[in-house]
A protein has these predicted regions:
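An alpha-helical, amphipathic repeat domain used for nucleic-acid recognition
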Residues: 1-236
Length: 236
């Protein structure tokens, strides 16, 4: 079998800003190694020096295999970094997305490990971001946020820490939850005002429960807005 040789080594396409300085990228500069088979493989400048790659040089099969693996790794890392450039993500989200793109598991694991070590992947930072964004939108309570985080692969301990930091026992945080719940109730009341009081309360409570608000927040919100008053007066 004729040995594979290098026909050209040229600069690769421009990577993302994060890719240029991320883990396992060496100097971060990327090259395209063109083989005489027509195949193009991405490697870093450091890879070129480390493997002694030169135009016209013949490559042993094990070197070709190493370059192929390196190309696959760099491609997967670039995809992951592009996803992270859009918004923070959990490590499990990256794992799932790389799997959907048919990235081999061992390469995906290596990418996730390297990006975690470099600080680009951080489940706690992602959880804090997610909680902050969802609370700012005033749409969901802490139980729903915890469920969302767990669904995205964040551990229970990390999810609880992020929620504790955001909500905890702080009166201001509880007030923010109640304001969010009240906004949902006010919007729903327009469609529910003709219902009997007991049925209206059940529907509003179910709405807030689905959105992840605690029983305490639900009761305080409904009482503050006044929808519990007809029931409480009839009980008295």
């Amino acid at each position: 079998m004729r040995p594979t040789s290098i026909t050209a080594i040229r600069p690769a396409g421009r990577p993302t800003a994060a890719a240029r300085g991320s883990a396992s990228g060496g100097s971060g500069g990327l090259c395209c190694v063109v083989l005489d088979t027509g195949r193009r493989l991405r490697v870093t400048i450091d890879d070129v020096a480390r493997c002694g790659l030169l135009e016209g040089a013949s490559l042993a099969p094990e070197i070709v295999a190493r370059l192929v693996a390196r190309d696959a790794y760099l491609g997967a890392r670039e995809r992951a970094l592009r996803l992270l450039a859009i918004r923070p993500r959990s490590a499990d989200e990256i794992r799932v997305r790389l799997g959907q793109q048919r990235v081999p598991r061992e390469i995906a694991r290596a990418v996730i490990a390297d990006l975690t070590a470099a600080g680009y992947l951080d489940d706690l930072a992602f959880a804090r971001f997610w909680v902050t964004q969802r609370r700012a939108a005033r749409r969901y309570g802490p139980r729903r946020l915890r469920w969302d985080l767990r669904r995205k692969g964040v551990s229970a301990a990390v999810a609880d820490q992020a929620l504790s930091e955001a909500v905890g026992g702080d009166e201001e945080a509880r007030g923010a939850d109640e304001r969010a719940a009240a906004a949902l109730v006010q919007r729903a009341l327009a469609a529910d005002r003709r219902l009997p009081p007991d049925r209206r309360v059940r529907r509003l409570a179910a709405l807030l429960e689905r959105r992840g608000f605690t029983a305490e927040t639900i009761a305080r919100t409904l009482r503050t807005i006044g929808v519990l008053a007809p029931l409480e007066s009839s009980d008295g």
